[in-house]
UniProtKB/Swiss-Prot annotation:
GO biological process, one term: intra-Golgi vesicle-mediated transport
Annotated protein name in UniProt: Probable coatomer subunit zeta-A
Topology relative to the membrane: Peripheral membrane protein
Lineage: Eukaryota, Amoebozoa, Evosea, Eumycetozoa, Dictyostelia
Primary localization: cytoplasm
Species this chain originates from: Dictyostelium discoideum (Social amoeba)
Function: The coatomer is a cytosolic protein complex that binds to dilysine motifs and reversibly associates with Golgi non-clathrin-coated vesicles, which further mediate biosynthetic protein transport from the ER, via the Golgi up to the trans Golgi network. Coatomer complex is required for budding from Golgi membranes, and is essential for the retrograde Golgi-to-ER transport of dilysine-tagged proteins. The zeta subunit may be involved in regulating the coat assembly and, hence, the rate of biosynthetic protein transport due to its association-dissociation properties with the coatomer complex.
UniProt cross-references to Pfam families, sorted A to Z: Clat_adaptor_s (PF01217)
Compartment list: Cytoplasm; Golgi apparatus membrane; Cytoplasmic vesicle, COPI-coated vesicle membrane
Subunit text: Oligomeric complex that consists of at least the alpha, beta, beta', gamma, delta, epsilon and zeta subunits.
Amino acid sequence: MSSFLYTVTSFFILDSSKGERVIAKYYNNDFDTLQKQKAFEKKVFDKTSKVNFGGEITLLDNYLVVYKSFSNIIIYMVGDQNQNEIALLYVLNSFIDTLQNLFENSQINKKLILDGINYTLLTLDEIIDGGIIMESDSAVIADRVGIKAPDNDDLDESINKAVTSVKEQLFNFLK
């Protein structure tokens, strides 16, 4: 059964200038200490930060690494070398699409990620549970996270209902 499951061993976001950790989640025991995690992140950063053509997929120490670079961060998703690289890249893109949807198409950057850390982590948790990829549809994920502001039409309708209710209560009180 496990051959039908897509899994992730780790997910992290690094500062693109220094390779410092912004966010990291590890899902297996290969990197059970902070020292091992940071050493792996450094190796990944050293390999991927030198790529000038914007590569999105690489192999490192029996791990498949997919990543996307932005203005001041790099977002990484790591699976074992037997995972489907297209599936991992699709899930990474779904994570990014969800964030762009939730943050109203704002440019993804370190400040946005840190200012919206709760939403960023909740989005990640909706996609990955214990290392198993549970969802990859960005619209479904954004709906589950549910932080979008209401549309103006919905807000107007809510205000109109409240005003009508107050009028009715006032009218009944004055009778």
